Each structure stands twice: as C-alpha cells, then as structure tokens.
Regions:
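C-terminal helix/juxtamembrane-tail motif
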Residues: 2-6, 529-553
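N-terminal membrane-proximal hinge/A-helix region immediately C-terminal to the signal-anchor transmembrane segment
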Residues: 2-137, 141, 146-150, 165, ...
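Conserved cytochrome P450 K-helix E-x-x-R motif and the immediately C-terminal K′/meander segment
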Residues: 61-82, 362-414
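Cytochrome P450 heme-thiolate monooxygenase catalytic core
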Residues: 120-132, 166-329, 345, 350, ...
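Cytochrome P450 heme-binding "Cys pocket" and the immediately downstream C-terminal segment
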Residues: 340-342, 460, 477-529
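Hydrophobic, well-ordered secondary-structure elements that form the walls
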Residues: 346, 389, 422, 446, ...
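Conserved cytochrome P450 K-helix/beta-meander segment immediately N-terminal to the heme-binding cysteine loop
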Residues: 427-455
Length: 553
C-alpha cells in the first residue's frame, strides 16, 4: 500500500531484524524445532512439512508490486485474516525457527513491559549482536539485564527535557545549512535526493548531541573522519552476504574491511571520550554537555568496560539517531503535500505562534530566545502531525526471544494463553497502529486531528508504539520529535512539497490537482514501503514557495 519514500537502508534493516536474524541464527541455535507444541497458535494457513509457511509467503508477495516490504505484505494478509492478535510463521527451510508476529496492542505490551521474570522486559533476540559493527556490541541497542540498566542510567541525563531544550540552538544552527541547500535547489530547479539533505542534517545534529563533534555532513569535502568511516563501514556491512554461514564470511575481503573500519571507528570515538573525561576530572569548564560527556560525570576512573560501553553507545546513537529523524521528516513532507487541510492548519498554527512572517530566519530568531520552550509547547497541531506520521510510518521494530524453559506466557484478548518459549517475538507497529478496532475506517488515512480534542483519550497509549514501549523504548525519541518540530516550524511556510513518480499527485485537464472524497489530493498510484533500500530523487523549482518534488524510479 504505502512505499516508504526515500527509505534508507538502516530503517529497512531495523524493520527486518527478525528476518535477517534468522539467516545468521545458527550462531545461537541449531537442531529441529518441535512444531507440534505450537499447532494451536494462529497461523496464516496450514504449514507445509518441508517448506513451512514459505508457500504462503511467496503467494502473498506475488500479489502486488514485488518491491513492497514484508511489513506491507503482512499487513495485506492480516486484513484478509481478520486481524488476528498474533500470527505464527514457520520460517523453514530458511531456518528451523518460528516467528510470532504480535499484531495486538495488549499482547505487545506483555512483550515489552517489565516482569518479575524479566526486569528489563523479554530479552532482545541474539541476532541483534550481528548489528554490532553499526550499533556496538555493548550499547543500549544490544545489551540486556543489569548491564543495560546501568548504562541507561548513565545516559539518561543527556535526554532530560530541560537539556533537550538547550539543544534547540544546535538544531537551528544545523537547519540553517539545510534550508540554504533547499533554497539553492529552488533557484536552480534541479532534481535531487531529499534523503541526502535530511540525513545529513540529522547526522550533523546527532554528532553534536552525542559527542559534541562537528560531523560536517552538510558540507561537501569537509566531512569528519567519524562520518566518513561510519559511512564506509555501513556500505561494507550492507555488502555482507548474510546467506552465508558466519564462519564462511569471516575470511572474505569484505569481512576484513568491516573489522578494520570497526576498529578504526572505535579508536576515534574512544580518543574523543578520553579527552572529555580528562576535562571533567580536572574541572575544565570547556567540557561539553554532550550525551557521552554527561554520562561520564561522577566516574573517577574510565575503566575499559565503561570506555567500551560509551564508545558503543555513541555508535548506536549515530546509527539510530540520524535515520529515524530523516525518515520522519520525509514522510511528514509527503503527507503534507497531499493533505491541503493539514498543511493549512499547520501554517495557521505557525502564523499564530510566530507571527505572519514565513521567513525561516524570523522563526529562528524567536526560537533562539529564552521562551523557546513555551513556543514549542504551543505547537499542538505540529505535534499531532508528527504523531500521525509516526503512526502510519513507524521507523523500526523490536525482536525478542523468550528463553527455552522460561515458561514465558502471553495472554490473548480472548483469554487464551500461549507459552512462547523459543519463539522470536516481534510486535509489528505498522499493523498495531492501523488496528480498525481503534482507528476505524480512517486507519490508513493521515488525520492529525485524531490526536487532538476529547477523542484522543479513546486511543489506548499502547496503540502508538513507533519507538516501541516499556523500559527499552527508544531513548532519543523526544530528541527526534523535537528536531522535526523545529524543522517544520522553519520551513512549512517556505516550501511546498509535491511527489512525482510513484505516489505522484494527479491533475485534471487544466493541470489542477484533484481532491478526493476524503479531502486529499488524488494520486496516480499508491505509495508503499519498499523491501529493499532504494534511493529516490527530488526536485525543487522556484516560486513564491519552493516546490519540492519526490521522484521515484
């Protein structure tokens, strides 16, 4: 249905963790699975003894555009199946494992909440460690249990509300370059990839926030060694052949490259961390207020363990912190381009809060003042746009594994209890956040107003989980939302965004856009999330507002 425009590979990777993990899971599990114990679980169709549910997967994928992601394929099938609360899929012969897709908010809560048995919720799937080159093996993303608790406690000061407000200046400073790039494209009328601009902006912000380093992602030819190394490492990771056993991959040239770049990045990050810690110890007033530096306060000795945790956590934020924000911005631009009522409501709110001057500099001047927190808090409709965008297009998911013999039990809405030991448990936010029981006939529509007024109270909190929920909810989610809010405040009245290619707006014989019965502009084709990362292009052409066109191939 919906193709994630300009989707970056990291988000695809996160969304596919439950699947990719199975390709490498021989590192952690081998042997046959006794499927009889799960025979009573909801399944899409009868399982083939030799091929599991792959016949169903292949049939489902064949009905529609082959580029669409597995989440979209799953969503299509779940609707046909009547929205079961869970769905068990046998992944043989890929691997002798089962995936339990969690499709109901009440069941998902049981997976992500704490319990007497699991103090930080059900553990992450071991396949998460395969992401170590990108997110670190000792980071918030990959750790579990008490070590995760201790690290999270150290990291939290960098994400407190008052500290986040102090970062508005950083966001505005980096957004200035972003806006300049848009202005240049508008003047030249060039086609360009908007994901490059949004991703570079997000990189620049997360670099300052995480370890107070200028990554210079938006300045060609001046990118920092951290950024260049990380991107080279990312490309090498993407080139990894995950269908091969890890031992067969280990001696390949690409794996040697990954290990070399992994070590290089680790050395650079640790050198920066050690310098900041030394400043703290000697009481140097120039010590930064970055997440990494704040996490080191009160630590007299920088042990190898703490140094590695901090380095890996910086890497994890570099990975997750840039892509989530970039994707969110792109989807918001697209939805506003096809919803004239939402765009008008947003612009009216910005006029009311910042005054009628649409120039980004006028907004920037006010947000640099002491009352920026109050100004941002008044942007209720902007908040609703962000929340609705994340509802329709959640940036990631989670994959958990209930240990064998743990007796982990999930209770379905009808009271039935399922013992899920040994299963991969993955709540699918894209489906949960489109539950017709909660969101009704507008489940697939962009309706920011649903989050405003009395009706918002009818939406259970657990039905909105784009950053997941529970103690392992994405730590930087509020930073991402604030960054997008600031960007929208600066540019929403300056630029018009129009999609071309897949999802392009339709027009009548006079070239005028056509409103459908729901008040959205009609499109020539539907847009859907893709299963592989494919960069898209955009074009800006100058007018009173610059018109940004997203171009799909």
């Amino acid at each position: 249905m919906l193709e994630l425009l300009l989707l970056h590979w990291p988000t695809v990777l996160l969304a596919a963790i439950p699947l990719i993990g199975l390709l490498i899971s021989r590192n952690w599990k081998s042997g046959d699975v006794d499927f009889k114990q799960y025979a009573h679980f909801p399944q899409p169709e009868e399982r083939d003894e030799k091929r599991g549910h792959w016949p169903w997967i292949e049939k489902s994928a064949a009905v529609g555009d082959p580029r669409r992601s597995f989440d979209i394929i799953l969503y299509e099938q779940v609707q046909k199946l009547g929205f079961p609360p869970v769905l068990l899929v046998d992944w043989r012969p890929m691997e002798p494992l089962l995936i339990l897709f969690i499709l109901d908010n009440t069941v998902a809560e049981q997976v992500t909440k704490t319990s007497k048995q699991f103090s930080t919720s059900i553990p992450k799937h071991p396949a998460m460690q395969d992401l170590a080159p990108l997110v670190g093996s000792r980071s918030l993303v990959t750790l579990d249990g008490d070590e995760w608790k201790g690290l999270r406690k150290r990291i939290l000061p960098g994400f407190q509300p008052q500290h986040l407000l102090s970062l508005v200046k950083v966001i505005l400073d980096k957004s200035k370059l972003f806006i300049e790039h848009l202005e240049k494209r508008a003047e030249l009328g060039e086609e360009f990839r908007v994901d490059e601009l949004t991703t570079n902006l997000a990189f620049d912000v997360i670099g300052i926030v995480t370890f107070d380093m200028e990554l210079n992602a938006q300045i060609p030819g001046k990118q920092s060694p951290v950024l260049l190394t990380y991107r080279e490492l990312s490309h090498a990771y993407i080139a990894r052949d995950v269908t091969k056993h890890w031992l067969r991959r280990y001696f390949t040239e690409n794996e040697r490259k990954i290990r070399r770049l992994d070590k290089k990045l680790d050395v650079i990050l640790k050198e920066n961390i050690q310098k900041e810690h030394a400043k703290i110890i000697r009481g140097d007033a120039t010590a930064s207020r970055s997440v990494a530096t704040l996490s080191l306060h009160g630590i007299e000795k920088l042990t190898p363990e703490i140094l590695q945790q901090t380095s890996d956590t910086c890497r994890g934020f570099l990975f997750a912190g840039h892509d989530t924000t970039s994707i969110l911005m792109q989807w918001a631009f697209y939805e506003l381009s096809r919803s004239p009522s939402a765009l008008k409501a947003l612009r009216d709110e910005l006029d009311e809060v910042f005054g009628p001057d649409p120039n980004p500099s006028a907004v920037t001047k006010q947000l640099l003042g002491p009352g920026n927190g109050d100004l941002l808090n008044r942007l209720k409709y902007t908040d609703a746009i962000i929340k609705e965008t994340l509802r329709l297009y959640p940036p990631g998911t989670t994959a958990r594994l209930a240990p064998q013999g743990s007796g982990t039990t999930l209770t379905l809405p009808n009271g039935e209890k399922l013992v899920v030991d040994g299963l991969v448990l993955t709540p699918r936010a894209l489906i949960i956040q489109r539950d017709p029981k909660i969101f009704g006939e507008t489940k697939d529509d962009f309706v920011p107003e649903r989050w405003l007024g009395p009706e918002a109270a009818n939406i259970p909190e657990s039905c909105w989980r784009p950053y997941e929920r529970g103690p392992r909810r994405c730590t930087g989610s509020e930073l991402a939302n604030m960054e997008v809010k600031v960007v929208l405040a600066c540019i929403a009245r300056r630029f018009d965004w129009v999609k071309v290619g897949l999802g392009e707006l339709d027009a009548d014989e006079n070239g005028q856009r056509i409103l459908n019965e729901k008040g959205y502009y009609k499109t020539k084709s539907e847009i859907f999330t893709v299963g592989l990362s494919k960069m898209r292009s955009c074009r800006l052409s100058g007018s009173i507002h610059a018109n940004l066109f997203f171009l799909s191939d």
